[in-house]
């Protein structure tokens, strides 16, 4: 969409009263973004009768320096520099009322190393702006100069693998089920059986903190006893994600320190704690040589719908800057939202040294990562051993595959469920390394392995008909049609 700048110049720019945003300098179609600019792509849905150019200029204004009327104090600032600039508006393919608005922000508008400050502008009051039916932050380009003000993941994929001494395959985990109600002793039994059976990790779920049925100290003690026994029994390094999420930072630090003192190598936090708490825990994890796992609890309240909110690809970028080592990023084949092409984009953001623009995966900008450590994506939610060929093909080696119900729901017990998943993974990795077509031969490869592994045979029989084939609500706009889950 092309429309010339209508910015009012000179003294008329500062006349008292209300002025269109585009005339105030927030629409600059000839602007060439600088390498140091923060660039955002918004999906805007204007109210009926609202011009999309004016809507884009309004988003630029309300997310940077503007208010609803002209203020004389603009003349006391370098307004030309600090005003965000909407410089391009494109109609969203296959829509009549949605537009992609590209907006550039001067780097000086943001505090170094602060996700809280960045988000206060980019997704602040502007998301309640009445002239818009909907507003969604689709993607951001964060310049190298800004990226380098963040610590990034404290451990990273390479060092995590070195600590675990596990290479050449995805890591295996399981969320303890039921997520609520177990006593500390029984919780620890689940952890031990799963780790002894072949998993690398177990984890707390997002809402297990410190409830009447199980105090957090009790859980930590029983879990670490289970980890130590499983390590002794198997000769492998094991771990369990101890959720330190709590009401205050003081409580979270206390729990994290207790986990460290018990010998844990990993702690967990929930996305709902907020960005300041997340960055604080990431700095603590770096100081204490701990892996930090982020459960994305709550994200779908604002990432799932296409017309309003924030895309998860943006959340993944912010999380990598903030410094978490793991993040739940979707499974494609599981029970939770996950378009294949879109999920591929999420995984690229986590693991790339430089993420290239790829519209078919929902990536709108090239993104340099300035040597920040890579972040391990986690696949969790409704997956089982019978999908192992799909998971390995779609998600690759550098991921954690978490089979909660797919381990603990095994008809032969928890240890058997873990063994089934470990055998399924190792037979699939071996077949891939031998050059076999695991996508098409996957079921056959699993059946071959199951002939000498009863737990795997039982898993394949139990969940053979379980699929979650629903069309995704968040597929790339530059694909021809929405892609159904595999």
UniProtKB/Swiss-Prot annotation:
GO BP terms: reductive pentose-phosphate cycle
Positions with a binding annotation for substrate: 125, 175, 179, 296, 328, 380
Family annotation (SUPFAM superfamilies): RuBisCo, C-terminal domain, RuBisCO, large subunit, small (N-terminal) domain
N6-carboxylysine sites (modified residues): 203
Catalytic residues in the record: 177, 295
Alphabetized Gene3D superfamilies for the sequence: Ribulose bisphosphate carboxylase, large subunit, C-terminal domain, RuBisCO large subunit, N-terminal domain
Protein EC: 4.1.1.39
Disulfide bridge partners, by residue number: none
Catalytic activity entry: 2 (2R)-3-phosphoglycerate + 2 H(+) = D-ribulose 1,5-bisphosphate + CO2 + H2O; D-ribulose 1,5-bisphosphate + O2 = 2-phosphoglycolate + (2R)-3-phosphoglycerate + 2 H(+)
UniProt: Mg(2+) binding residues: 203, 205-206
Listed InterPro entries: RuBisCO (IPR033966), RuBisCo_large_chain_AS (IPR020878), RuBisCO_lsu_C (IPR000685), RuBisCO_lsu_C_sf (IPR036376), RuBisCO_lsu_fd_N (IPR017443), RuBisCO_lsu_N_sf (IPR036422), RuBisCO_lsuI (IPR020888)
Family to which the UniProt record says this protein belongs: Belongs to the RuBisCO large chain family. Type I subfamily.
Binding partners and assembly: Heterohexadecamer of 8 large chains and 8 small chains.
Miscellaneous note of the record: The basic functional RuBisCO is composed of a large chain homodimer in a 'head-to-tail' conformation. In form I RuBisCO this homodimer is arranged in a barrel-like tetramer with the small subunits forming a tetrameric 'cap' on each end of the 'barrel'.
Protein name: Ribulose bisphosphate carboxylase large chain
Taxonomic placement: Bacteria, Pseudomonadati, Pseudomonadota, Alphaproteobacteria, Hyphomicrobiales
Name of the encoding gene: cbbL
């Amino acid at each position: 969409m092309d429309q010339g700048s209508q910015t009012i110049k000179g003294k008329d720019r500062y006349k008292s009263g209300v002025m269109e945003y585009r005339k105030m300098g927030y629409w600059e179609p000839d602007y060439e973004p600088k390498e140091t600019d923060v660039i955002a792509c918004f999906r805007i849905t204007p109210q009926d009768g609202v011009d999309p150019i004016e809507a884009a200029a309004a988003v630029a204004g309300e997310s940077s320096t503007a208010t609803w009327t002209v203020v004389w104090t603009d003349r006391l600032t370098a307004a030309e520099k600090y005003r965000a600039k909407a410089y391009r508006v494109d109609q969203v393919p296959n829509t009549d009322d949605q537009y992609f608005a590209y907006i550039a922000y001067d780097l000086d508008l943001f505090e170094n190393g602060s996700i809280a400050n960045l988000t206060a502008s980019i997704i602040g009051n502007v998301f309640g702006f009445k002239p818009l039916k909907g507003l969604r932050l689709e993607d951001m380009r964060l310049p190298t100069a800004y990226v380098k003000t963040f610590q990034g993941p404290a451990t990273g994929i390479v060092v995590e693998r070195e600590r675990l001494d596990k290479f050449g395959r995805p890591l295996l985990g399981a969320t303890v089920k039921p997520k609520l109600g177990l006593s500390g002793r029984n919780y620890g039994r689940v952890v031990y059986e799963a780790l002894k059976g072949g998993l690398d990790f177990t984890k707390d779920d997002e809402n297990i903190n410190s409830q009447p049925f199980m105090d957090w100290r009790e859980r930590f003690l029983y879990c670490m006893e289970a980890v130590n026994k499983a390590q002794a029994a198997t000769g492998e390094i094991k771990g369990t994600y101890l959720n330190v999420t709590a009401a205050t930072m003081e409580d979270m630090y206390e729990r994290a320190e207790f986990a460290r003192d018990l010998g844990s190598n990993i702690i967990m936090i929930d996305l709902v704690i907020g960005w300041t708490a997340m960055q604080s825990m990431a700095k603590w994890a770096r100081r204490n040589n701990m892996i930090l796992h982020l459960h994305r609890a709550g994200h779908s309240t604002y990432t799932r719908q296409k017309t309003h909110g924030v895309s998860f690809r943006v959340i993944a970028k912010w999380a990598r800057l903030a410094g978490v080592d793991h993040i739940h990023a979707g499974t494609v084949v599981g029970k939770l939202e996950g378009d294949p092409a879109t999920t591929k984009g999420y995984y690229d953001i986590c693991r790339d040294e430089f993420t290239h623009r790829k519209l078919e995966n929902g990536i709108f900008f090239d993104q340099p990562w300035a040597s920040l450590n890579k972040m391990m994506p986690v696949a969790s939610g409704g997956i089982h051993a019978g999908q192992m060929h799909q998971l390995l093909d779609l998600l690759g080696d550098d991921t954690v595959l978490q089979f909660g119900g797919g381990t603990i729901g095994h008809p032969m017990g928890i240890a058997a469920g873990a063994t089934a998943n470990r055998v399924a993974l190792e037979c699939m990795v071996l077949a891939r390394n031998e050059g076999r077509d695991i996508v098409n031969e996957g079921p056959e490869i699993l059946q071959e392995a199951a002939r000498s592994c009863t737990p795997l045979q039982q898993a394949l029989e139990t969940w053979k008909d379980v699929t979650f084939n629903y069309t995704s609500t968040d597929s790339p706009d530059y694909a021809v049609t929405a892609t159904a889950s595999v």
